[in-house]
Amino acid sequence: KRLQVDSNLSGLTGTTADVFRLLPSVVTDIEGGITFRGSNNPGLLINGVPYGLLEEYSGDMLIQLPALFFDRVSMTSTPSIGLVPDGDAGILNLSSAVYTAADSPLVLTLGAGFQERYNAGAILNLHPGKFHIVGKYNYRREFRKRTFSKSTTNKGGTTVMNNNASARPDVHLADLSVGYDLTANDLITVYGLYNLMDYSRYGKIHNNKLVDGNLQPVMFRHRYNDQRQEAYAAEARWNHTFDNPKDRLDVVFNYNNFGYDEDNEYKNEKPETGKIIAE
């Protein structure tokens, strides 16, 4: 099953996770996690290649990646021999958008929402002589708020924990493809991709204790949980088309790297005095 993003208005302006929801047998949750044919461990590829940024923290990435950046998503439970068959249930593949000389040389996108949520993107499409140059960039800023309450009762009484947290992910995604026609049947291409997701996160946990029917403040916990994910890739391709256009030879060399760093700083505050008692 394949879904062409630019011909589907409900997926055109969304994220990659939004588009996956349009595929049968695929379920995504609010955190971007994917379940495919009952398994939460499908293989995730970009242009048929496994990327580090889609491995351990793939859910976080999929709810940030702009859908139109990839143009097409596809799924298969029986991947071909040309794909790395990781995953318990099959393969979900993201295909980069392909632009030709017939397409606009410059495309600009802009979106905005409530609570300072917005995104902006640009596509540069040039084909001078035998060269094919396509560069894409997208910036996305979001706001997330989480609130929950938990009560624990034991012999010493009831403890109530109220947790309020907010996060502002800043996401940059860029790639550049430069192709050259060696012959009418041979195209060589160099490709690079860079992704940066930088979270600014703060949480405030308010612990109270209910003793003899009276609610007593115990502690405020301030949690500073900033997060940074950075990935880059370099790729070289050779595509040869034989006399029969259906016969092709594709050679791809890809190197990609992924890094993740998360802070977990906290300070415990005594509500009555405002004094920091632990950090």
Regions inferred by a protein language model and the residue ranges of each:
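Short beta-strands and strand-coil junctions in structured, solvent-facing domains, enriched
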Residues: G52, P79-L83, E142
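Short loop/turn motifs that connect adjacent beta-strands in outer-membrane beta-barrel proteins
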Residues: Y99-S104, N185, T241-R248
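Short, acidic, small-residue-rich periplasmic hinge/interaction motif at the N-terminus
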Residues: K1-L9, D29-E31, S39-N41, S77
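N-terminal periplasmic accessory domains that precede
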Residues: T16-V19, S58-I63, V73-M75, I81-T109, ...
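Extracytoplasmic beta-strand/coil segments of soluble accessory domains associated
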Residues: A17-L53
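Extracellular/periplasm-exposed beta-strand and loop segments of Gram-negative cell-envelope proteins
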Residues: G111, R146-T153, T159-L173, D198-L210, ...
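Transmembrane beta-barrel wall of Gram-negative outer-membrane proteins
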Residues: E116-E142, G157-G203, D226-H240
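Membrane-embedded beta-strand positions of outer-membrane beta-barrel proteins
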Residues: L106-L110, G135-Y137, V190-G192, L249-F253
